């Protein structure tokens, strides 16, 4: 578990070349969808990552207050912010998280 503004040394080690990003395809544009719709969107994201041979780890996202549902997500390894932004846009997201090796996690708006 981590927060925006914190460093995550474990992920820095796994993504030492370009950094890493945290991305979900759930609830595009911050609009709540059904579980079924969200799972379809998540599968489309996974298919895209596999087809492009992008390295990733399964992940989940949520807020500490519980006001927003937990979302399936991915941690993309060795990905620059520009490429992560393109993926976020492709999958309808308003924002994603990104960190350069050795730097704090940043919230990146698309």
Short names for language-model regions:
Residues 1-47:
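N-terminal, charge-rich interaction modules
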Residues 34, 38, 101-104, 109:
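A generic "folded-domain core" signal
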Residues 43-57, 93-94:
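Structural alpha-beta junctions
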